[in-house]
């Protein structure tokens, strides 16, 4: 899903179903490393909820606070991800994927989903997934 470097740690996020070694309701697993050789698994970052399973996405450190989520001195880590509504998919809906946002204010140790998810509704596309976010310095925008 994504890798980001923040305050001396590499953060790796990955799709994960913690209950079995088969496909199921996806979560975002989370691991950190200081050297990219030795990894520590942290608690699951993102869990499925009423909007759906947690599919692919990306994460950034919002140094410029473009999200407006900063509190105190720590830049927020912000993740954008695909919600996959399996019940809607099973019913034949073409708009079963939307985009959600989550953030961490404690170096990725805990995550809060944005209160107004989904942040991007499906515009009528069958495959509306895998959002990527990056900072464009020339225009000072995401």
Give the positions of each predicted feature.
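Beta-rich carbohydrate-recognition and catalytic domains
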Residues: 1-131, 135-142
């Amino acid at each position: 899903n994504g890798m980001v470097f923040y305050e001396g740690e590499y953060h790796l996020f990955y799709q994960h179903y913690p209950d079995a070694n088969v496909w199921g309701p996806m979560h975002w697993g989370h691991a950190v490393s200081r050297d990219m050789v030795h990894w520590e698994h942290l608690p699951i970052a993102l869990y499925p909820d009423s909007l759906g399973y947690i599919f692919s996405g990306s994460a950034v450190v919002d140094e410029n606070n473009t999200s407006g989520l900063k509190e105190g001195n720590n830049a927020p880590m912000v993740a954008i991800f695909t919600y996959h509504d399996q019940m809607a998919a099973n019913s034949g809906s073409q708009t079963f994927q939307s985009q959600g946002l989550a953030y961490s204010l404690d170096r990725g140790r805990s995550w809060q989903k944005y209160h107004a998810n989904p942040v991007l509704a499906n515009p009528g596309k069958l495959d509306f997934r895998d959002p990527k976010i990056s900072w464009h310095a020339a225009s000072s925008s995401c």
